[in-house]
């Protein structure tokens, strides 16, 4: 068995980028920054073009191919949409490969070699000032972390990001509902190191963990609360779901008990093929990813409840997508075909509700009503015995396919990192 020190020694090596990679990301960043600055200046826009986020603080992971450049507007009469229009017009003239993305407002994603550079307009705000868009906080976040994140903590941030990525909870988008890069860095600043974050996380309790850098009177109702130091009315951990928080708690406990490099090496576990599954597969809609994930998680949750009402036992379910061609709902079930009859439990015989139960079923084609113990029961015919028919009844006609027992994704695989 490897010791904690031995595992950490090897793990730190995984998050140190090569000199060539560091040089390349600097070159691409500066190249795009100069271009954007030139376009903004020529457009007569009063703004500062700068790099924030992990790229600016050196907390990015090896292999990361995304860079964030911000256009910080001093003039609030200028709309982010105007900035995007000026940038995309010039990018088109130059023959560059760009795409329009959406958060609270549009921004531009520019493809440079094998890097994706997001160019995000935002407004300049002062500490404590109410932001107009979520991106407005980014310069303040950068200032706070740059002043507090020590040089020897940069590797700890990278290691924590890799740990979170491996266990599937890195990213604040709706797809993941996990820990943002900013939140990850805040945790290292607060607790001091990667291992101290894990020691603390192993003792966290949902809805009882409150981390703050500043005094605030704001009340938050989230599994995890980390008060944003640049905006005390905001919970920097608001995106973290109960499942994501609990996954980190479990991973931290197990890693501290049995350290292993598996927590830093994302991989797929082997599939358990004996279980039954059903997939509802849709073509990917032309909408922003957060919209798509939110929409299909809602559809998936409603269908999950419906399947249970129909008598299908669902072990687990999820939404999966390549964000290009498909989005699908996946259900791991006990069985995809049910027996034609089911036992239906009624009220106790001494309860007034038993009369309505008897009157409902006494003339129906059921077995019973009969009594077992103190309750009335019937054995009645199911409306749907095939899971596909049950799904069609709920979703109606639509542009989707139903696939039964063809799935071999993560929902039917062994958890590869857990020791």
Curated annotation (Swiss-Prot):
Its EC number is 2.7.7.72. GO terms for molecular function: ATP binding; CCA tRNA nucleotidyltransferase activity; magnesium ion binding; tRNA binding. Disulfide bonds: none annotated. Pfam families: CAA_C, NTP_transf_2, tRNA_NucTransf2. Its cofactor is Mg(2+). It catalyses: a tRNA precursor + 2 CTP + ATP = a tRNA with a 3' CCA end + 3 diphosphate; a tRNA with a 3' CCA end + 2 CTP + ATP = a tRNA with a 3' CCACCA end + 3 diphosphate. Belongs to the tRNA nucleotidyltransferase/poly(A) polymerase family. Archaeal CCA-adding enzyme subfamily. This is CCA-adding enzyme. It comes from Pyrobaculum aerophilum (strain ATCC 51768 / DSM 7523 / JCM 9630 / CIP 104966 / NBRC 100827 / IM2). The gene is cca.
């Amino acid at each position: 068995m490897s010791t904690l020190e031995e595992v950490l020694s090897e793990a730190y090596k995984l998050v140190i980028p090569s000199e060539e990679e560091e040089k390349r990301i600097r070159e691409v960043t500066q190249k795009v920054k100069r271009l954007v600055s030139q376009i903004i200046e020529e457009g007569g826009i009063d703004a500062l073009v700068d790099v924030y986020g992990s790229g600016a603080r050196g907390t990015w992971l090896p292999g990361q191919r995304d860079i964030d450049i911000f256009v910080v507007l001093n003039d609030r009469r200028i709309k982010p949409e105007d900035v995007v229009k000026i940038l995309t017009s010039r990018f088109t003239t130059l023959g560059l490969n760009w795409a329009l993305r959406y958060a609270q407002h549009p921004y531009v994603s520019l493809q440079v070699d094998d890097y994706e550079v997001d160019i995000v307009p935002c407004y300049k705000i002062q500490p404590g000032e109410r932001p107009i868009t979520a991106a407005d906080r980014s310069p303040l976040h950068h200032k706070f972390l740059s002043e507090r994140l020590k040089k020897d903590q940069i590797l700890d941030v990278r290691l924590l990001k890799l740990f979170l990525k491996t266990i599937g909870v890195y990213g604040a988008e709706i797809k993941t509902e996990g820990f943002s890069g900013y939140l990850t860095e805040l945790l290292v600043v607060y607790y001091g190191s990667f291992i101290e974050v894990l020691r603390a996380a192993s003792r966290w309790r949902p809805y009882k963990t409150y981390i703050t850098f500043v005094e605030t009177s704001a009340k938050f109702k989230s599994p995890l609360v980390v008060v944003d130091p640049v905006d005390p009315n905001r919970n920097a951990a608001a995106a973290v779901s109960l499942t994501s928080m609990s996954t980190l708690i479990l991973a931290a406990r197990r890693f501290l008990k049995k350290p292993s490099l598996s927590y830093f090496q994302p991989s797929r576990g082997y599939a358990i093929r004996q279980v039954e599954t059903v997939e509802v597969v849709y073509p990917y809609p032309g909408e922003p990813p957060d919209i798509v994930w939110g929409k299909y998680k809602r559809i998936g949750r409603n269908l999950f409840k419906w399947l249970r009402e129909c008598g299908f036992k669902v072990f687990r379910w999820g939404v999966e997508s390549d964000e290009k061609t498909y989005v699908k709902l996946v259900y791991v079930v006990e069985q995809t075909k049910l027996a034609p009859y089911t036992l239906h439990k009624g009220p106790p015989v001494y309860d007034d509700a038993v009369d309505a139960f008897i009157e409902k079923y006494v003339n129906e084609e059921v077995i019973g009503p009969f009594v077992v113990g103190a309750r009335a029961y019937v054995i009645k015919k199911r409306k749907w015995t095939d899971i596909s028919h049950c799904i069609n009844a709920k979703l109606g006609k639509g542009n989707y396919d139903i696939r039964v027992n063809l799935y071999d994704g993560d929902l039917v695989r062994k958890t590869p990192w857990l020791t």
